[in-house]
Amino acid sequence: MTDNIPLQPVRQKKRMDSRPRAGCCEWLRCCGGGEARPRTVWLGHPEKRDQRYPRNVINNQKYNFFTFLPGVLFNQFKYFFNLYFLLLACSQFVPEMRLGALYTYWVPLGFVLAVTVIREAVEEIRCYVRDKEVNSQVYSRLTARGTVKVKSSNIQVGDLIIVEKNQRVPADMIFLRTSEKNGSCFLRTDQLDGETDWKLRLPVACTQRLPTAADLLQIRSYVYAEEPNIDIHNFVGTFTREDSDPPISESLSIENTLWAGTVVASGTVVGVVLYTGRELRSVMNTSNPRSKIGLFDLEVNCLTKILFGALVVVSLVMVALQHFAGRWYLQIIRFLLLFSNIIPISLRVNLDMGKIVYSWVIRRDSKIPGTVVRSSTIPEQLGRISYLLTDKTGTLTQNEMIFKRLHLGTVAYGLDSMDEVQSHIFSIYTQQSQDPPAQKGPTLTTKVRRTMSSRVHEAVKAIALCHNVTPVYESNGVTDQAEAEKQYEDSCRVYQASSPDEVALVQWTESVGLTLVGRDQSSMQLRTPGDQILNFTILQIFPFTYESKRMGIIVRDESTGEITFYMKGADVVMAGIVQYNDWLEEECGNMAREGLRVLVVAKKSLAEEQYQDFEARYVQAKLSVHDRSLKVATVIESLEMEMELLCLTGVEDQLQADVRPTLETLRNAGIKVWMLTGDKLETATCTAKNAHLVTRNQDIHVFRLVTNRGEAHLELNAFRRKHDCALVISGDSLEVCLKYYEYEFMELACQCPAVVCCRCAPTQKAQIVRLLQERTGKLTCAVGDGGNDVSMIQESDCGVGVEGKEGKQASLAADFSITQFKHLGRLLMVHGRNSYKRSAALSQFVIHRSLCISTMQAVFSSVFYFASVPLYQGFLIIGYSTIYTMFPVFSLVLDKDVKSEVAMLYPELYKDLLKGRPLSYKTFLIWVLISIYQGSTIMYGALLLFESEFVHIVAISFTSLILTELLMVALTIQTWHWLMTVAELLSLACYIASLVFLHEFIDVYFIATLSFLWKVSVITLVSCLPLYVLKYLRRRFSPPSYSKLTS
């Protein structure tokens, strides 16, 4: 590659997700529900429907009683090799093709299918029981005859449903009334969106004002709602009451909804049902995620195809050596049946059972408590990771915010000077309460102090008011909001919010004297240091979104009548909203370099007329059904101009325990770590340094902000000249580079020891994962804890979710769930490495077992003039791959080359695993040669040493074959487990005991002779001893790296 990257022509920007996705309407049409469209729902009158709606039945089953068996069998036989074995078994019904008893071919196939059917049946029964439990839950329905009980499955669109506290919401509803005095309720949404914080919901104002719930049936009103869709965070609709003069219309948003699957956390609520059954938000979001097929499974499938090719070739060669005489096509089929053992039918079952064992071992590991395996099909992926992509907040850090800095422009207050802030707040409210008489004139010092105190007070008051935090009072573990609020007791107050940052800010204002003690949908109460209660009316709230990066609130001070618009947000958006100043950008950078999360706080005083004009336009925009979000944003932006900058806040999110040694372990294991975060560049860089993601002796190249192709070209050329340096790039620059220089950028970035992407959107995180997979062909692992990490986790080859403060959404979407980032090291170094090596050994032994007996069959047929006559029949051929050898071979899933402590202490062992794969074409060829050697040795030895009868050949060869397999397993095991010993002895005992019942195939009197024993011993020794000698020499002169640590 040249030092200079040529200027590239414009490339079309790729879609963020190339996989086709069906929209909501297409989904509904496929389900038979017709085209989804908006609806009008009359309160309490389900018969007044303008279209048919699905029943409110939850059904997560894949099959029903009649389709279960056909469906399971179809899913199994759509795979070529399962269908191949079915055809072979069916061929035994044709007399010319029969080689022995029917059960010889049907029993192995039946066993494999039985395991699958039983597994599917258990899962289906579990789904049926869960669905029946949900569908049978009883609720109260308001009717003209009073309150009646109704099952969840019988609820219809238009019903008025009463949901009690701690009860699950049965359908998607509009919130009409609540029993809470504050006119709102809290919902627990962790089962819907994975977030553990409670969500505040507000009833329709018109219906909340009615005297009783029964009056809902006396008014003529309806809800106009948008068509069903999958968006759980937004809703557009209107409520209209026709029998009032004039008719009342209210806009409805997400704050007025009660989605099915959420749980009422406070009070009793009444709602009108909007969506049921398959149109529920929760059901429409329950889609099957991308099915991840492990790279190991793909490699095994490839080897199986090679074996199939060998099967066909050997069969054709056998017939060709007969010169295609007679009905040669029947002979080909007979040879395909004879050598069908070349393809091990039990391989998939063994590997699946092995994965179950790996998952069980991971869950039982006491050193990584709380780890959950949600996808048991890809544990081997953990042992082959080359790129780890991690979120920052809540993943590397604790997501426990600590207030560290208040900056007013001319003065900054840190932790050591918070007493000054407290004294300023105290002085303000002390002066107000004393209300001193007029003096001759304040001194200059007093004026300066009052000026500073008022600035501090305005900043603290803004922080105490501008948020979505609600104080919840608990007494003796039982929520008793009304009683506790009367006294505003500090001991039983808990803050509920969707963001840990907001809770940290409100807790800080409490520590300096201004405490949030009460809040409902229309008011807020603050308590001053003198225990005075300040009352504020909430006029409007503009919630935080990832797109806007800010939130705002308009409040009216009840004591003065002043209306104030407060806003806080990220510096990148607030810089264009606040009045011109010369310190915002510089101080934001300084605080970010200290690792602080910075928020900019501003305010704007509004005249009564100004607010009334805004409210009229805002209400009109909210009543719009089409493009509501755009119209509302336009109205809000009209206020967001020339706001007064009050302060900057800095909160610190400390690193989790043992993050530094974990990242060092991953780096030494040859895994490159990329940090993808939404934080600003300086904060992300500081965290990367503190976490030692970037080592002290590494340079950091901060990719300059680029906005077009030419700037990207120049910056990439500058970056190309750097060597062994970490890259830090913003999401905006990343988007430009990927648009014009995707290949060049990824090639350079992959050479970096570490990469930090800041201001990264969720879709960009997923795009980076996809590009790494496409450009490098290496396996990726994505780690995150929040909803914005889900797309990245699902896109990666192996997704790991961290259960954190932001909820369980990432954890539920991941393949593996951990409680702390430090557990990732053991998950990869120990369990990933062991799973990969064990599956490799298991698959090779299963293939070796099949090739050995197939080689013996080939030798036998060749000696007897290429006759298509089976060497072993009946129970011998079935028992060989089951009770005689299955347990020892499967016990390899318990083997390990080094202790767990050693694997953690020397992560270089993981790197060696990536370089020299335990399952490759080279190792496969070695095991093929071993199988051919041992099969030939056993068969020729038996033919040379047998005395007179054919049954002697069978007895000598089969016994030698069983002993060879058991010895090969014993020679391969590196760390003995007591179960391995039991498996070896049990298999040998089963064989010896079964000889009594195998007199049809084996001469029982012959095997008791000394002649039989020495012949079997010699053959077994010749087949195994050379391999043991080679293994010893290799270990002596070219030992593997792990052997140096175990010797």
Swiss-Prot record:
Positions bearing N-acetylthreonine: 2
Organism: Homo sapiens (Human)
Record keywords, A-Z: Acetylation, ATP-binding, Cell membrane, Disease variant, Endosome, Golgi apparatus, Intellectual disability, Lipid transport, Magnesium, Membrane, Metal-binding, Nucleotide-binding, Translocase, Transmembrane, Transmembrane helix, Transport
Gene Ontology cellular-component terms listed: early endosome; early endosome membrane; endosome; late endosome; late endosome membrane; perinuclear region of cytoplasm; plasma membrane; recycling endosome
Reported function: Plays a role in regulating membrane trafficking of cargo proteins, namely endosome to plasma membrane recycling, probably acting through RAB5 and RAB11 activation. Also involved in endosome to trans-Golgi network retrograde transport. In complex with MON2 and DOP1B, regulates SNX3 retromer-mediated endosomal sorting of WLS, a transporter of Wnt morphogens in developing tissues. Participates in the formation of endosomal carriers that direct WLS trafficking back to Golgi, away from lysosomal degradation.
Residues annotated for ATP binding in this entry: 391-393, 502, 544, 549, 568, 597, 677-679, 759, 765, 788-789
GO terms, molecular function: ATP binding; ATP hydrolysis activity; ATPase-coupled intramembrane lipid transporter activity; magnesium ion binding; protease binding
Keyword Magnesium: yes
Extracellular side: 92-96, 326-332, 863-874, 943-949, 1000-1006
Gene name for this UniProt entry: ATP9A
UniProt subunit comment: Heterotrimer with MON2 and DOP1B; this complex regulates SNX3-retromer mediated endosomal sorting of WLS. Interacts with RAB5A and RAB11A.
Taxonomy of the source species: Eukaryota, Metazoa, Chordata, Craniata, Vertebrata
Protein family membership: Belongs to the cation transport ATPase (P-type) (TC 3.A.3) family. Type IV subfamily.
EC code: 7.6.2.1
Disease: Neurodevelopmental disorder with poor growth and behavioral abnormalities: An autosomal recessive disorder characterized by global developmental delay, impaired intellectual development, absent speech, and behavioral abnormalities, including hyperactivity and attention deficit disorder. Affected individuals show failure to thrive with poor overall growth, and some have microcephaly. Additional features may include non-specific facial dysmorphism, hypotonia, and feeding difficulties.
Catalytic activity: ATP + H2O + phospholipidSide 1 = ADP + phosphate + phospholipidSide 2
Membrane-spanning residues: 70-91, 97-119, 304-325, 333-354, 842-862, 875-893, 924-942, 950-972, 979-999, 1007-1030
Topology with respect to the bilayer: Multi-pass membrane protein
Superkingdom of the source species: Eukaryota
Protein name per its UniProtKB record: Probable phospholipid-transporting ATPase IIA
Topological domains annotated Cytoplasmic: 2-69, 120-303, 355-841, 894-923, 973-978, 1031-1047
InterPro entries according to UniProt: ATPase_P-typ_cyto_dom_N, ATPase_P-typ_P_site, ATPase_P-typ_TM_dom_sf, ATPase_P-typ_transduc_dom_A_sf, HAD-like_sf, HAD_sf, P-type_ATPase_IV, P-type_ATPase_N
